[in-house]
């Protein structure tokens, strides 16, 4: 047997994954934990310039199915490095690079938005290398970063019911063995355009 590839894992999980919650959507609407009044008009929408100083550096995107993962190491000033790998018995796909985010903006006390400014790959997309055993490694685009312009950073305490549908799917992957909490208990980064989600803690 061989491990599922990234594409196979996404297809499989799309069929079996459903939102895990111990409350109905209507219950959650009535029990939102965020008090919007706690965020002053002077802070909401303010250009923050940097992310929180205590933001964890390392984030990972993984579904728990298949031999693939994508990661981001990010600094509060928006500079980052990223990588991706996917493998099976006969071949592997890898990617890596570095870049910067700009227009970091504080939305509310649990949420920042930012835009991808630059990203440079470490190697040429499509390049293939074969080892002595015939295993082929291909340098690909970086899943999780490629195709994205706008990214959202969620802080612990962010109400999960307010997050977009794409992020809800990754919450289901992340909290695969426990109910999705009403308030996020870790940090997360969400690619709004391609709907990919990263977390700073392992699958639960």
Feature locations, PLM:
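Tryptophan-anchored aromatic micro-motifs
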Residues: 38-71, 185-203
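Subset-of-secretome marker
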Residues: 7, 15-20, 67, 83-92, ...
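Intrinsically disordered, low-complexity segments enriched in small/polar residues
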Residues: 12, 40-43, 76, 95-97, ...
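N-terminal Sec-dependent export signals
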Residues: 1-53, 200-203
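Generic hydrophobic, helix-prone segments enriched in Leu/Val/Ile
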Residues: 1, 60, 101, 151-155
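N-terminal glycine/threonine-rich, aromatic-flanked beta-hairpin/loop signature
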Residues: 64-128
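Beta-strand-rich cores of mature extracytoplasmic or soluble domains
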Residues: 127-204
């Amino acid at each position: 047997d061989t491990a599922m590839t990234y594409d196979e894992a996404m297809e499989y999980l799309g069929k079996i994954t459903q939102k895990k919650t111990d409350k109905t959507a209507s219950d959650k609407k009535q029990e939102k934990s965020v008090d919007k009044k706690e965020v002053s008009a002077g802070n909401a929408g303010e250009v923050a310039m940097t992310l929180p100083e205590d933001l964890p550096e390392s984030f990972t995107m993984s579904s728990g199915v298949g031999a693939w993962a994508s990661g981001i190491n990010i600094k509060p000033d928006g500079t980052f490095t990223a990588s991706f790998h996917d493998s099976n018995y006969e071949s592997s796909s890898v990617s890596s690079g570095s870049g910067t985010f700009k227009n970091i903006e504080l939305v509310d006390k649990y949420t920042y938005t930012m835009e991808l400014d630059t990203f440079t790959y470490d190697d040429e997309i499509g390049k293939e290398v074969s080892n002595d055993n015939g295993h082929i490694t291909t340098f690909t685009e970086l899943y999780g970063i490629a195709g994205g312009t706008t990214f959202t950073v969620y802080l612990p305490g962010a109400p999960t019911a307010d997050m977009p549908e794409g992020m809800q799917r990754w919450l289901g992957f992340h909290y695969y063995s426990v109910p999705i909490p009403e308030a996020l208990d870790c940090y997360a980064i969400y690619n709004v355009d391609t709907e990919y989600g990263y977390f700073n803690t392992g699958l639960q």
